[in-house]
Structures are given as C-alpha cells and as structure tokens.
Amino acid sequence: HFPAQLSGGEQQRVAIARAVAKNPAVLLCDEPTGALDSATGVVVLEVLEKVNRELGTLTVLITHNAGIADMADRVIRLSDGQIAEIHSNAAKKAARELSW
C-alpha cells in the first residue's frame, strides 16, 4: 500500500512503528489522535500503552483532548504557554476506559 491508501489510524500506527524502530528512550507524540475518530484513537492509544509498557519508553503525549490525561502517569497542563498545573494520576485509566 501507498501511504495515501492507508486510513488515518493505519498511518498513525505506521508512524509509531517507525519511531519505535530505533528503540528511543523518549517517544514524543504530538496529537496522535487529533484527526481520528474515537474508536481509532483508542486503538492508537493502546499501541502507545503497549510500547510504553513493553519497551519502557518514556512517552510524552501532547494533546488538546483533556480526557486522554486520565491514562497518564503524570499530567502537565499548560495555559497561555505557561505551566498551570502538574499532577500524578493515582488511578490511571486504560485507553478503553477513557471518556471522549
């Protein structure tokens, strides 16, 4: 398949696979679910969860979807380019448990 023939979710999974191929210490994901429907977004987040769990990669996820924060170990919220809040999640949720 050519890239244009892949769905948005497939393109995101390929992008994650390319990023993970070199076994990075840090995986920076800028809006990985931004252009996806919620079902496909959950699949992409599950892939990121699996990479984080199995490879021990530090995953930094940037998003405008505040609901995704519930699956993070640590959340840093920005407001007007400044750190507004930092907190840890005592009860993390799995990607399938998130509210969109």
PLM features: residue spans?
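ABC family nucleotide-binding domain
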Residues: H1-M71, R77
